[in-house]
UniProtKB/Swiss-Prot annotation:
Organism lineage: Eukaryota, Viridiplantae, Streptophyta, Embryophyta, Tracheophyta
Signal peptide: 1-22
EC assignment: 1.1.1.-
Domain FAD-binding PCMH-type: 77-251
Disulfide bonds: C32-C99
Organism in which the protein naturally occurs: Arabidopsis thaliana
UniProt keywords, alphabetically: Cell wall, Disulfide bond, FAD, Flavoprotein, Glycoprotein, Nucleotide-binding, Oxidoreductase, Secreted, Signal
Record protein name field: Berberine bridge enzyme-like 22
Compartments, as annotated in UniProt: Secreted, Cell wall
Description of what induces expression: By jasmonic acid (e.g. 12-oxo-phytodienoic acid OPDA).
Free-text cofactor note: Binds 1 FAD per subunit in a bicovalent manner.
Amino acid sequence: MRELFMYLFLLFLVLCVKSVYSTPTREQFQNCLSTKQFNSTLKNPINLTTHTLDSRVHTDFSESSSPNSSFLNLNFTSLKPILIVKPKSESEIKQSILCSRKLGVQVRTMSGGHDYEGLSYLSLSPFIIVDLVNLRSISINLTDETAWIQSGATLGEVYYKIAKTSKIHAFAAGICPSVGVGGHISGGGFGTIMRKYGLASDNVVDARLMDVNGKTLDRKTMGEDLFWALRGGGAASFGVVLSWKVKLARVPEKVTCFISQHPMGPSMNKLVHRWQSIGSELDEDLFIRVIIDNSLEGNQRKVKSTFQTLFLGGIDRLIPLMNQKFPELGLRSQDCSEMSWIESIMFFNWRSGQPLEILLNRDLRFEDQYFKAKSDYVQKPVPENVFEEVTKRFLEQDTPLMIFEPLGGKISKISETESPYPHRRGNLYNIQYMVKWKVNEVEEMNKHVRWMRSLHDYMTPYVSKSPRGAYLNYRDLDLGSTKGINTSFEDARKWGETYFKGNFKRLGLVKGKIDPTNFFRNEQSIPPLF
């Protein structure tokens, strides 16, 4: 009898513990969203779009690391989201935050789903996804040359709206049309006119954020410290950015683009080496990036370098400038094409001549591919022999990639403490490393990831040091990750200072004020510092 009593008592304890710590179900979350407490601000609670779990997306989440099988998370196994929330109003975002707090689940906010490690749609802990796809309005004011952009908009949607409104305006941001504005801006935002106008985050003049209590703040009510943190510090650590107000950039009606491709070899190595010394020092109107990749010619792999260029002016200005600063490239007028700024976006996406409406396609991503990426900053020209070794290593892979993005210009004129993005003066260019593959198997993944890590290790002597810099928007969990809600600030320094250098401490202090319980967190979020 005593044994039976003990058994029943232990069973009771187990059931109690299970009830306390069990993961909330989809139905529980829906019930929370449907209660009067959370629906008081809605005119018609029955029509809540938050009660959706897209079956296609849900299936893909269970089979891969992203909604479109384009991104790979290498460092942790994801749980399926309890719910994919697709709010149609800001009040529904508030409901999602409050219910998540009540039920003890994390919130992952997804703007475009391009986080390189999947942190906008993956988690080790029980979580929901707040997909901002329905909140993507764009309001342009040409009088003061600004735009209010909701975080669910993609860069392609923003560019299309600008182009339909003005022939002489642009926005200083990236070239990938399907990238979401929310994450891109909050991580910095490289682009083809950044040497003239700075990063996307440098052009933010106001923002609206929903905090952990569901309160909406703008620049005035959030204060300058939090506004500073959002512009390059990764907004997902602080709340849900609802919208950004950005400065538009003036561009000429006609810009000039050209592509110059060459097989890698001694002469090409000299060209790339020469570019390193001048890319960041050229006229601010001139952006020349270098892409190193390979292709199959017959049964043989060939490594090539491509100089991809945008000039904010005509051919008649560009040719003399190139002859003076970079005559080694041998640029001719017939190599160049004049076009509108919006056409240059198509050009950089290898889609010249296609309808502009393709920019509105939110699914323009790598097709059926997985990848691993890393980044670096170069402060002194890399020796020529390094490119010889890179060429040898590229011949081992089907789809390796290195992209050199020139810095300098406006980027270097901004203090490294003016925003969380610190990689300013003294940096010649950024390197993005990437390797892609199609077979979704562990052995295949490990083979390519080992290759990527080996290349990154090889480059160690030639890139920035103390700390070795990295770019947040090319997120890399190899740098380190948090250990849940109780991760110490000191533990996070290893990767935090890699992205933010000395700004990491200030980000922690801001986090401690706006989100002291660390509700908004992921595997590389900012821990609170008090």
